[in-house]
């Protein structure tokens, strides 16, 4: 089967990119590819028999027209000016059989006009982390870009140490970022901002294209998608680590996996990025940062969208966020209805978990085993202050009894939303260290495990992290 690629971005937004081809690595070789995603995209298996080929930027498929996009943004709350694809190249937009499209973005593709002081390269460590994280998020049901392939090479890349150069192909319906709009707004080119909005609506919100109120309705949906995404991050315990405006997806996807981390101990102020000295992107600050980023996007639209309409959309953010968050947390607690005491019970559990530094994922998974008429719980042994747990647990069981639902039905629901497995940093690190020594077994094994995060397991993937694996420092260097 021949893959079909189109050139909408190249044809319709000529001032937003520089056309150029990837710069191949030395002795590049394919070490992993996403078979399930490849099947979804109808990619022939024969394409993966090459050592590198398109996966390593050595060849292009018919119809591909590679380019690097320009955008700007606020980084850590400060205007950073022009940024852009400093090491990534959009290879092409695949047209699928159902009429939708999928961007193919090659990360680590070499120098571009937007590389600034960088070398245009990515390292094996960061490509493995992104592949694992994006697939983990996908199987958790959270909107995200996805990873299609990884190549490693003999090309040295200099970071804190010398690391092997690598490339990753990331796919997504679109790579439109808040930063695309900021770029032209701050260049005082509002018509180009409008062109970006029209492009987005035409291709991703086509049902609004002929509506005279299309810009307001479109921005309302961008706000809602962002609020929903952040609610999902918070419920699963995911910290992004670098929520700059250029890393915010217009479609509400999790984009740009850098110094991310899933909670081990429940620590509301968890900071996963060791460069975030002020804690701007701490776990508990993510909802506020996302709203701040939406405000920056709204500002770019103000030349052609009424400010009152923009503010109304922004004002809806918190309620949408709380609605999604509340629904998901009630499911995690096994509540089938909404009662006035629910928030208090949840907050009391969080307070107890924070005091005891309880493991976030394990706590909710073990809570899924609760029998509403039994005071016995395997979770009790996870707490030092047994009296405090017993008091909370008795009231929790009383709340469960209000719903008049069988234990088996409720447990089934809870186990479908409380994962047994999340991508803890130490699991990724173990796969990385093996891969850097040439052993890809753990990389493939972990990828396979992450496809079933809600299944019970008996291995160390679902155990408490070892002491060395807690609070691993992760930086933006990749």
Swiss-Prot record:
PANTHER family from the UniProt entry: PROTEIN ADENYLYLTRANSFERASE SELO, MITOCHONDRIAL
UniProt-annotated binding residues for Mg(2+): 247, 256
Homology family: Belongs to the SELO family.
Protein name: Protein nucleotidyltransferase YdiU
UniProt-listed Enzyme Commission number(s): 2.7.7.-, 2.7.7.108
Keywords from the UniProt entry: ATP-binding, Magnesium, Manganese, Metal-binding, Nucleotide-binding, Nucleotidyltransferase, Transferase
Species per Swiss-Prot/TrEMBL record: Escherichia coli (strain SE11)
Molecular function terms, GO-annotated: AMPylase activity; ATP binding; magnesium ion binding
Job of this protein: Nucleotidyltransferase involved in the post-translational modification of proteins. It can catalyze the addition of adenosine monophosphate (AMP) or uridine monophosphate (UMP) to a protein, resulting in modifications known as AMPylation and UMPylation.
EC class of the enzyme, as a word: transferase
Positions contributing to ATP binding: 84, 86-87, 107, 119-120, 170, 177, 256
Keyword Oxidoreductase among UniProt keywords: no
UniProt xrefs under NCBIfam families: adnlytase_SelO, PRK00029.1
Active site: 246
Reactions catalysed, as given in the entry: L-seryl-[protein] + ATP = 3-O-(5'-adenylyl)-L-seryl-[protein] + diphosphate; L-threonyl-[protein] + ATP = 3-O-(5'-adenylyl)-L-threonyl-[protein] + diphosphate; L-tyrosyl-[protein] + ATP = O-(5'-adenylyl)-L-tyrosyl-[protein] + diphosphate; L-histidyl-[protein] + UTP = N(tele)-(5'-uridylyl)-L-histidyl-[protein] + diphosphate
A Pfam family the protein falls into: SelO
Keyword Iron: no
Necessary cofactors: Mg(2+); Mn(2+)
């Amino acid at each position: 089967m021949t893959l079909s690629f189109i050139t909408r971005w190249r044809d319709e937004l000529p001032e937003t990119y520089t056309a150029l081809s990837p710069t191949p690595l030395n002795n590049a070789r394919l070490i992993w590819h996403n078979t399930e995603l490849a099947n979804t995209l109808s990619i022939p298996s024969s394409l993966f028999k090459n050592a590198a080929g398109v996966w390593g930027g050595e060849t292009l498929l018919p119809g591909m027209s590679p380019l690097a996009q320009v955008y700007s943004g606020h980084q850590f709350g400060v205007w950073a000016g022009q940024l852009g694809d400093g090491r990534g190249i959009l290879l092409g937009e695949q047209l699928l059989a159902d009429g939708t499209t999928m961007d193919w973005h090659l990360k680590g593709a070499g120098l571009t006009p937007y590389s600034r002081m960088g070398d245009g390269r990515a390292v094996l460590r960061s490509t493995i982390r992104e592949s694992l994280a994006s697939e983990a998020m996908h199987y958790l049901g959270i909107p995200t870009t996805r990873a299609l392939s990884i190549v490693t090479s003999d090309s040295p890349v200099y970071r804190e140490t010398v690391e092997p150069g690598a490339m990753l192909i990331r796919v997504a319906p679109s790579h439109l970022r808040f930063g695309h709009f900021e770029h032209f707004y701050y260049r005082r080119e509002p018509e180009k901002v409008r062109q970006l909005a029209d492009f987005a609506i035409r291709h991703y919100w086509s049902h609004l294209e002929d509506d005279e109120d299309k810009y307001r309705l479109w921005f309302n949906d961008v706000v809602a998608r962002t609020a929903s995404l952040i609610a999902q991050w918070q419920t699963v315990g995911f910290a992004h680590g670098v929520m700059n405006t250029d890393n915010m997806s217009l479609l509400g996807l999790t984009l740009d996996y850098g110094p991310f981390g899933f909670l081990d101990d429940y620590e509301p102020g968890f900071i996963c990025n060791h460069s975030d000295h002020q804690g701007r992107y701490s776990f508990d600050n993510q909802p506020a940062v996302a709203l701040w980023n939406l405000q920056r996007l709204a500002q770019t639209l103000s030349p052609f969208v009424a400010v009152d309409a923009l503010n109304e959309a922004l004002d809806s953010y918190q309620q949408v966020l709380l609605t999604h968050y509340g629904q998901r947390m009630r499911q995690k607690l096994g509540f089938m209805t909404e009662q006035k005491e629910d928030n208090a019970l949840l907050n009391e559990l969080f307070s107890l978990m924070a005091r005891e530094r309880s493991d976030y994922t394990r706590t909710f998974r073990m809570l899924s085993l609760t029998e509403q008429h039994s005071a016995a719980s395997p979770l009790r042994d996870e707490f030092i202050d047994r009296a405090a747990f017993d008091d909370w647990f008795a009231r929790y069981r009383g709340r469960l009894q209000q719903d008049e639902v069988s234990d088996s039905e409720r447990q089934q629901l809870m186990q479908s939303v409380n994962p047994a497995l999340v991508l803890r940093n130490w699991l990724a690190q173990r796969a990385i260290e093996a891969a850097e020594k040439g052993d890809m077994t753990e990389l493939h094994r972990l990828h396979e495990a992450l496809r079933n995060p809600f299944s019970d397991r008996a291995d160390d993937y679902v155990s408490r992290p070892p002491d060395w694996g807690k609070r691993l420092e992760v930086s933006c260097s990749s």
